[in-house]
Amino acid sequence: MQVLLVEDDQTLFQELKKELEHWDFFVTGIDDFSAVMDIYEETNPEIVIMDVQLPKYDGFYWCRKIRQVSNVPILFLSSRDNPMDQVMSMELGADDYMQKPFHTNVLIAKLQAIYRRVYEFGAEEKRTLNWQDALVDLSKDSIQKGDSVIYLSKTEMIILEMLIQKQNQIVTRDTLITALWDDEAFVSDNTLTVNVNRLRKKLSDIGMDTQIETKVGKGYMAHE
């Protein structure tokens, strides 16, 4: 697995690089933190590990840049004890977030889970779902309604797929969290809310934001 590790703390970078390579990850680092996108495009990584606090521009800036061209999984690292950093990372389309210090075994487990979810899922035959008058392409993470197309993150698509498969039924928040993350203890309840709100915002671009209903205290429901 090719990993781009965007971390300016060289001691931590070397520790993580050594551990990741022990697990057969191929790790590329950054020398020039004003050229993160150049390195990203050269290496075409399968997963990006991104520190929040970086020289030149912060990790959120680079996440925005990457999301303009790719849905590659992004996992944020941060030493700041600020819940809004986690909220911001989810709003920008990151796949996971870890606060320093952390155990490397947990990082490895998260990376392996992300890889299975994104690439083994993506390797399946093309699958589509018809939802109302829209075509949901699970292999491309896209929704087409008429001539309009929107693209979702992997997390948003997993949420939408679960809701569509149980149309007019309530899917509980716990069910969604369990499906999205292997260990729900590492996920705040607010993280799911952020992802659903971001999904609704994208659906609003094709006039479908009202088709996902919040059931207060329970979960969410997609209408037929």
From Swiss-Prot:
The Response regulatory domain, residue ranges: 2-115
Modification sites for 4-aspartylphosphate? D51
SUPFAM superfamilies, from UniProt? C-terminal effector domain of the bipartite response regulators, CheY-like
InterPro entries with a match to the protein in the record: CheY-like_superfamily, OmpR/PhoB-type_DNA-bd, Sig_transdc_resp-reg_C-effctor, Sig_transdc_resp-reg_receiver, WalR-like, WH-like_DNA-bd_sf
Which residues carry the record's DNA-binding region feature?
A: 126-224
This protein's superkingdom? Bacteria
UniProt xrefs under Gene3D superfamilies: 3.40.50.2300, Winged helix-like DNA-binding domain superfamily/Winged helix DNA-binding domain (1.10.10.10)
Q: Which keywords are on file for this protein? A: Activator, Antibiotic resistance, Cytoplasm, DNA-binding, Phosphoprotein, Repressor, Transcription, Transcription regulation, Two-component regulatory system, Virulence
Q: Which SMART domains match?
A: REC, Trans_reg_C
| Compartments where found | Cytoplasm
- UniProt GO BP: regulation of DNA-templated transcription; response to antibiotic
What is the recorded post-translational modification?
Phosphorylated by GraS.
| Cellular component per GO, a single term | protein-DNA complex
Coarsely, its chief localization is cytoplasm
Q: Which GO terms describe its molecular function?
A: phosphorelay response regulator activity; transcription cis-regulatory region binding
Say what the protein does. Answer: Member of the two-component regulatory system GraR/GraS involved in resistance against cationic antimicrobial peptides (CAMPs).
* Record protein name field: Response regulator protein GraR
Q: Which organism is it from?
A: Staphylococcus haemolyticus (strain JCSC1435)
